[in-house]
Amino acid sequence: MHFRIEHQWNSQPVAHEPVTISLKPGDNGLQMDINAPFFNDPPAPPGPPGQPFPGLWDYEVVEAFFLNSEKEQYLEVEICPHGQHLVLLLSKRRNIWKECLPLSLQVFKTDTKWEGSVLLPWDYFPPSVDQFNAYAIHGSDSKRTYEALYPVPQDALKEGQQPDFHRLEYFRPFSFCTLMGKNWKQPESCLWKI
């Protein structure tokens, strides 16, 4: 399953090669591969590569959200080209109840591109994931750019509106069965027994 982030959050086209996200079955989880332009703006977060970094969304990052739309429970995964990551479990919009979960992450970068590969354990996913969205952020100050796989439609924009990646109403249908087979059942998560 492949996705291309071709628009900014407000439906304007991006001005560079689109970020791509690929999802495929992994060993006891979902393999997520990222291919993106490398802007190196802002500079690397001060945390060590390979470790969780709170507030990673303030840096150059690609994010994927997996949502159970009925209960508004979702997994947010953030990957940085410098090797840091952030995993958030949320119940209701913006309500983080678990964060900084570990990930096994590989990142390769050149002067102009980067690739990330991560295995997302099934335990991290809320039950009955049925919607998805993905985002990319880069740039500093007035050059800060927010991109969305499924952006806010232009006719829904309001004057003065700012980017908000937790607008769950703009997520779109998603099914693991497309990847795993029609009879596949999502493994039960120990973490989501709340």
Curated annotation (Swiss-Prot):
Lineage: superkingdom: Eukaryota
Family of this protein: Belongs to the UPF0462 family.
Protein name per Swiss-Prot or TrEMBL: UPF0462 protein C4orf33 homolog
Organism taxonomic ancestry: Eukaryota, Metazoa, Chordata, Craniata, Vertebrata
